Every structure is written in C-alpha cells, then in structure tokens.
UniProtKB/Swiss-Prot annotation:
The gene is Gpx4. The active site is at U73. It catalyses: a hydroperoxy polyunsaturated fatty acid + 2 glutathione = a hydroxy polyunsaturated fatty acid + glutathione disulfide + H2O; 2 glutathione + H2O2 = glutathione disulfide + 2 H2O; tert-butyl hydroperoxide + 2 glutathione = tert-butanol + glutathione disulfide + H2O; cumene hydroperoxide + 2 glutathione = 2-phenylpropan-2-ol + glutathione disulfide + H2O. Keywords: Cytoplasm, Developmental protein, Lipid metabolism, Mitochondrion, Nucleus, Oxidoreductase, Peroxidase, Phosphoprotein, Selenocysteine, Transit peptide. It comes from Rattus norvegicus. Present primarily in testis. Expressed in flagella of epididymal sperm. Isoform Cytoplasmic: Highly expressed in testis. Present in spermatogonia, spermatocyte and spermatid (at protein level). Its EC number is 1.11.1.12, 1.11.1.9. It holds the Pfam family GSHPx. Essential antioxidant peroxidase that directly reduces phospholipid hydroperoxide even if they are incorporated in membranes and lipoproteins. Can also reduce fatty acid hydroperoxide, cholesterol hydroperoxide and thymine hydroperoxide. Plays a key role in protecting cells from oxidative damage by preventing membrane lipid peroxidation. Required to prevent cells from ferroptosis, a non-apoptotic cell death resulting from an iron-dependent accumulation of lipid reactive oxygen species. GO terms for cellular component: cytosol; mitochondrion; nuclear envelope; nucleolus; nucleus; protein-containing complex. This is Phospholipid hydroperoxide glutathione peroxidase. Monomer. Has a tendency to form higher mass oligomers. Interacts with FUNDC1; this interaction promotes GPX4 recruitment into mitochondria through TOM/TIM complex where it is degraded by mitophagy. The modification Phosphoserine is found at S40. It comes from the Eukaryota.
Length: 197
C-alpha cells in the first residue's frame, strides 16, 4: 500500500484521535486550512450544540442532509417541521440530519447555543444540532467551504449560501450529491432519498 493511500485512510482516525488532546482539535479539524484537500464530509469535525467536538466520520455509511438553520426566519416553521418529519420516517433507514445555526442572514439566529437548543426542542428535534457557525466568508466553517465547491454542491449565481435553510444531500461515502436552495422545502428531498438510502 502506498504512503499516500495509507495517509488518506488514517487521516479521519488521526483527526478524531486529536480531538481528545486539548488545543489540537481546533488546528487539526475545526479550523483546518486544508479543507480543499478533503475528499468527503467524513474528514471534518464540528462542535455540537453543547460545545463538544464531533468527528463527522461518525456519519460514514449514512445518508445526510446538512442545512443551515435560523429560528426567526419566515421559513423556520416549514423547514423544522418537515426536517423533523423526514428524520422520524427515515432515520431507521440511515438518514441523518445535521443542522448548523447561522446568524449571517438577516440576523435571524441571534440566540446562544443553549437558546437555539431550547427553541429546537419545541419542534421535538431528534436530529443532530451543531453550534452556531458562519457559512460564508473567511470565517465560514471548513465543511461549508468544502460543500460549496463540490461539483454537485455549487450554487446558482455563485457558490455562496444565499439564505437560511440551504440544504446539501450527502451520500453514504460523504460526497455531496445535490444542493437545494433556501426556497426548496425539505419534502422535495424525499424523492431523491431512495437513490441513496
């Protein structure tokens, strides 16, 4: 086995192992500058809503919907309601939903992570909530930088996220297979799920 192949295989394990070492998590995962080299979502890490670093390798073998969320958007109710419904119906089939709060659009997610968690509990959210992040600009989370430049993750009129509730469908190998704009409700993703679950 070549060194290059071995290092690619070990990289997710090394990144996850680094999470236990204080100070290394930020430099090796969450604020990595080498996001362009990633081949799948599984090579990234993010802080969950409670502030714990999570290696996204845990989603290997699952189909994922990754979305930016906001609690004060006109599309909040329909998106949370439909995401909860999709998760309830397809979680046993291997669907996972990753929700990333973001305050970049109309300042519609101003609360703390604890306030966001309490808000989501009002919808009986059982899918994975992550800490508030930026999805655009230099401070964007590396996962979001990566998803936006993938061949099937590019947007219309540029790759920037346009608003709350932009959604990415990720296959079992951690690759972006489709991007859905903020005006597309989660139920439209359902027709695409059978191809990947």
């Amino acid at each position: 086995m070549s060194w290059g192949r071995l290092s690619r295989l070990l990289k997710p394990a090394l990144l996850c192992g680094a999470l236990a070492v204080p100070g290394l998590a930020g430099t090796m995962c969450a604020s990595r500058d080498d996001w362009r080299c990633a081949r799948s979502m599984h090579e990234f890490a993010a802080k969950d809503i409670d502030g714990h670093m999570v290696c996204l390798d845990k989603y290997r073998g699952c189909v994922c919907i990754v979305t930016n969320v906001a609690s004060q958007u006109g599309k909040t109710d329909v998106n949370y309601t439909q995401l909860v419904d999709l998760h309830a119906r397809y979680a046993e089939c291997g669907l996972r939903i990753l929700a990333f709060p973001c305050n970049q659009f109309g300042r519609q997610e101003p609360g703390s992570n604890q306030e966001i968690k309490e808000f989501a509990a009002g919808y009986n959210v059982r899918f994975d909530m992550y800490s508030k992040i930026c999805v655009n600009g230099d401070d964007a989370h590396p996962l979001w930088k990566w998803m936006k430049v993938q061949p099937k993750g590019r947007g219309m009129l540029g790759n920037a996220i346009k608003w709350n509730f932009t959604k990415f469908l990720i296959d079992k190998n951690g690759c972006v297979v489709k991007r859905y704009g903020p005006m597309e409700e989660p139920q439209v993703i359902e027709k695409d799920l059978p191809c990947y679950l």
